[in-house]
Swiss-Prot record:
Subcellular localization, as worded in the UniProt entry: Cell membrane
Cystine residue pairs: none
One Pfam family hit: UbiA
Gene that specifies this protein: ctaB
Molecular functions (GO terms): protoheme IX farnesyltransferase activity
Main location: membrane
Biological role stated in the UniProt entry: Converts heme B (protoheme IX) to heme O by substitution of the vinyl group on carbon 2 of heme B porphyrin ring with a hydroxyethyl farnesyl side group.
Keywords: Cell membrane, Heme biosynthesis, Membrane, Transferase, Transmembrane, Transmembrane helix
Protein's membrane topology: Multi-pass membrane protein
Similarity-based family: Belongs to the UbiA prenyltransferase family. Protoheme IX farnesyltransferase subfamily.
EC number: 2.5.1.141
Pathway: Porphyrin-containing compound metabolism; heme O biosynthesis; heme O from protoheme: step 1/1
InterPro entries in alphabetical order: Protohaem_IX_farnesylTrfase, UbiA_prenyltransferase, UbiA_prenylTrfase_CS, UbiA_sf
Record's protein name: Protoheme IX farnesyltransferase
Amino acid sequence: MTVADPRLTDAPAHSRTSLLGRRRGGRPPRFPRAAAYVALTKPRIVELLLITTIPVMLFAAGGLPSGWLILTTFVGGALAAGCANTLNCYFDRDIDALMKRTENRPLVTGEVSPRQALVFATVLGIASTAIFVAFVNVLSAALALGAILLYVVGYTLLLKRRTSQNIVWGGVAGCMQVLIGWTAVRDSLDWAPFVLFGVIFLWTPPHYWPLSVRYREDYANAGVPMLPVVAKPTTVSRQIVLYTIAMVLCSLLLVPLGGAGVVYGAAALVLGIGFLVQTIGLHRRATRFEVETGGRDAGTLEQLKRISPMGVFHGSITYLTLLSAAVAVDPFVRVGWPF
């Protein structure tokens, strides 16, 4: 039997409502139960994943695919990501309760029971597979199912609590969306989607590690060995810079291996340099921080805030969004290279 969070069961009605509505800027949602189920899917992560899917479809088609194909791929991908994220919430509900960043997730507060979450995830997974098989193709369905298994089994169950490299290899699941977008159009794979797969794989550490620096104490209290928990800030920031350099170089490979034009190539170079400058700035701040603290430990949360890691976190989102836009636009304004 599921025991609901006492903040919900023992609090007055208005307190319970405010807790349920905290995710909506303090206002209670009109349909709190539906809002709780949506929260399980981590919609912001779903949005970020789908930002890469549709541009890849446009690039693969060399223009605009059918609206129906875009819609069914979008919905199928969103349902698959929602399934994986819900299962992640199910298996991580014990550590989510220990972290301030995640303590208001529905399985922690008792808004949704573990059994209800499992049923919900199963329905999402079945619906995703059915949509891909019926309206897209079997290869895309297999890749979507593979992404779910990689995220839930590979990342959540095997890696997250065991290694500081958890998000590096766990990030493979997030890379699958570009393969799904490509196969939805081509029903086959080529070098181009694997280049973009590599970009997102190398983008994942510079995206998640700054967030982990900001919430280092949360992860430490929950016993999750994120790299910022077990390593000094300079070690983390150095790794972020190295991954960013590799990511920028990988993004440029879409020109010779994927036939991308000048628009994409110029955007990839400019955006890459801009983001690299941000990560180098983070490393410099981390180095100063280590000198100030004498390198004794990673410091307190207030000290870590001086490194300003969230600027790089938000910068990574901007980078991926604009790079994806360049992927989408390139087929429509294809300008060939003079060599």
